[in-house]
Amino acid sequence: MLTLSKGASFRPHYAVLKLPHLHKKWMAYIHDPYPFHYYPRPYNWVEPGYDFKELFFKELSQKAKYSAFPSQLLKEWMSSYFPDFSKTGIVIPHQNEKYEVQNTSFPSYFDISKFNLLHAGNLMKQRSPEGLLKGFILFLENNPSAKEDAKLILLGDASYHTEMLKQYNIPEIYIHNGNKAFDEVYHLQKNVSVNIILEAKGEISPFLPAKFPHCVEADKTILSLAPYYSETRRLLGEDYPFWSEVDDVKKIASLIGKLYQLWKQNPDSLILSRKDLESYVSVTHLKEVMKSLNNNQ
């Protein structure tokens, strides 16, 4: 029996916790830190009734046969608060499901012949794109000719950063502060030069971004802007060259410059080419994980 969580709701977990006869076959999936005050900085949420939620999760960690997490770092993070998770925890990353884009036409703001960098996804208060924007501007200053063929595209709700974003109203940057159709974004991810994964500034980011499997499938170079200790960086590898702290403007500019030079030499050279990650986020891997649990019973 698998119980899933959504947002701040763990109601299915709470319900099964009250049914002891199901505990021996129960897998509790935990998608994010909980209670919310266990989020790493810069997140600083404290919910009403947090003490009750701590007791609830302590009991859950002790009673569920298995606990499942989308990332290794999240499993370790939650185990530091509830040690039983280290015994019962397994990692089930977000998977890719085969999907055919219905609308294959490109939007007016996208020119496939350009050096396009895309960040797709909501920019929460803690995920500021300012370092990326400053880094891109510095890249343009260092490479004046790039103004003819480079474009940074930001798609997704960024209401916390609206005023700051107004400062970057230039032709080389396209910002859509709001939602776009999945088809449109998914199609762009597969056709841009670089996909950007931007995370909050902090000491650690134990989350596996939901778009990570899409970026892996797109097979385009990923520019990872994340803490040194992050699940994205862990999966890409310590030696992955296109990683920077989210606010290191000079390094971001330098990395974009290197990517731009590679693109100028051969626009088709900016591929991710990570069969190991494609396998990791596949349904086949999920089946292998579940089979191993059955074999260990």
How would you label these PLM feature ranges?
Residues 147-156, 160-186:
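Nucleotide-activated donor-binding/catalytic signature segment of Leloir-type glycosyltransferases, i.e.
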Residues 11, 34, 47-67:
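Membrane-proximal helix-turn-helix segments that form the acceptor-binding/catalytic region
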Residues 1-23, 28-31, 36, 244:
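An aromatic- and histidine-rich active-site surface loop
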